[in-house]
Structures are given as C-alpha cells and as structure tokens.
Amino acid sequence: MLLARTHETCNSAVWSDLLAQENPVEKAITGETILLTGAGGFIGSALAEAIVRLKPGHLILLEHSERNLNEIDLKLAATSARDLYTSVLGDICDTKLLSEVLQRYRPDMVYHAAAFKHVPLMETNPFAAVANNALGTYNLAKLVRASGVASLLMISTDKAVNPISIMGASKRVAELALLNLDSPRTRMSAIRLGNVWGSPGSVVPAFLDQIFHGGPVTVTHPEVSRYFSKIEEAVELILLAAALEGASGIFIPQLGAPVKIVDVAQQLINQDGSKNGRAIPVTFTGLRTGDKMSEEFLSKEEVAEPTVDGELFRVTGNKIPNDSFHLHMSELSNCVAQRDLTVMIETLCKIVPNYRPTKLLRAAPARASA
C-alpha cells in the first residue's frame, strides 16, 4: 500500500472504541460548544461528522461556500438532531460576523479548518492567500482570545515549513500568529498535515479523471514526493491534537515514508486503467510554480519532542515573534487593502525570513506597471 500510514485507520471499530471508554478526545468534545471554520471543506466536513458522533453540546458550522455548507448541513441532518448544530454562511475575514458568532454561542473550542490551499492558484491570487490564511487567522485568534474561548486549533500544512509558495508563507504567518497570541486563558495550537488522499483538486482525483479519459496521466516530475494520509487518519490526528490537555504550539504526526507521485499514478493506472484494455502513459510536465520536489515537517531551527499520547510530536525551537509582529500584521493588512504586492512580499519576508518567493510572484509588480 502506497499510503504512508501514521497509525491505524480510524474506522468504525476505532470510533466504537472512542465512544465506549473515557478518553481525552471524547472528554474534549462531549457536551462542549464547538465552532468549526471551513466546515464544508474536505477536512472540515469529515471533522464535522466526527465531532457530531462524539455528542457535543452544540456545533457551529462556519463556511463561506453556500454549496458546501448546504451539503454538510444535509449530511448531518440525516443522522443528527437539527438542534445539535447551527450552520452559518460567512467568511472568516468578516470580523463583525466572527464577533457575533463568538458572543452568541460562546464556544468552548474552535477548530480552524478554513483556508485557501491550492498552491499554483494562490501564486496568481496572492492578496487572497494573505487575506484569508494569514490575516483571517490572526483576526480570528484575537477575537477568540478576547472572548475567553478555552482553545483554538488550526489545521496547518507541511508547506508552511521553509515556504517557497505564498500559500505556504501565509500559513506560516498563521502559525506565528497563534504562537504570538497563545495565553494561559486561551490555548492556541496548530497541527501540520501533509496531503490528504483524495481531497478535491489533488493528484488522486486528477489522475483518476485522466485515466477515465484514456490518459495520459500527467506528473510534474519523476522524483517529486509527498506525505499522504487518509481522511480518517487526518481527522483522528486533529482530534488528538485538540485533546492534548494544557498543550499549545505546533504539532506534527508520527511520519511514515514519503511517496513518489509517479508511484501513485502507476498504482492508480494498474488499478483502474486496465479496465479499458489499453496502456495508459505517464508524461512529465515540470514542477508548477510554488511546488517543491519534497515537503518537510520541520525547519532546521525546529525540534520535534514526543507528546504523552505517542501519536504526535510537539515542535519546539520556534522563535515567538516580539511586539513587531503586530506591526507587521498591520502592514500586511494595509498592503492587502491597497493591493501593494511589492511591500506585501517584503513584509512577509520580515515575518517569515526563510520564505523564498517565486520568480513569478516577484515579477508580478513589474508586469503590472509595464
């Protein structure tokens, strides 16, 4: 099996075990009021279903896509009482809405899954990446802290480590925002995940579509590799990270081996491509803007220390930003409002010194002024 497994899949038997005994995950959710941002996304919707199984006091689903919110709303309605959850159509960049939701529902815990994630798309939409991923998280964390919420957990990404894409840099800024705003009253944490198998827009659905149409299957580079987990595994890791009592900071899972994308393509071809009775070729197209050959979960300044549960590691060695961080975030906000890409990139590099912007992004201001 190609998937790099971090632990046993969280299948129905595992969920039965979770529900049958006292455990930190159940304790953290049962009877509690939970706010989930990005609730209609691939990870968010799976997380919503998992949370509902653990019987929260109330679950607030915040999602900016009407279609996605309606889908998760209907899915939960098929198995859960309507008064168990509330669906809120809105954007995490809407601070007035966030304040209203926090004041009205008084959540005990926030799971922050809302994010823009597609690397090449964000390279051509840099203001959206920074506004949503960086500033959206920063403002959410400030409001959560001011409201006295006990904890906030953000789903982060391995692309935040030594980022070369603006998506990765924006998520690293989001991580630093949580480290900066962490307090004894409100625990701020993040968990870095790799690629989730089968998520929309990822290689697996793209490969399956290419195979269905007879190929070729396009891979960026023969040596490019990624870490993969199944959605059930990702959800279980998120719930475990949120349930670590008294812990804050950044967490990473116990890792298996990375998987070559060309091997994923070949496995899917062998599995599904033989049905049409002809060979399906693989072609290499070159790395896309912002893509790496391989991803990392730790920078050279970071060290991973095991947690008590054994499934996760806490990342240490992060330099928590000083008071200038808030000034830089104000600068980022102004840059987004004024659409000043040059200064925005400069500010991102001040916040994330190891960010290496792509040539495409650096050339964008010159193209715009030409």
Question: Which sequence ranges carry the predicted segments?
Answer:
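Strand-loop microenvironment adjacent to phosphate/nucleotide-handling motifs in alpha/beta enzyme folds
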Residues: 5-9, 24-28, 175-196, 200-370
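Short secondary-structure boundary/capping segments
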Residues: 76, 104, 126-128, 168-173, ...
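Conserved Rossmann-fold NAD(P)-dependent oxidoreductase catalytic core, especially the SDR/UDP-sugar
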Residues: 106, 112, 116-172, 180-181
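N-terminal Rossmann/SDR dinucleotide-binding element
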Residues: 1-111, 297, 303
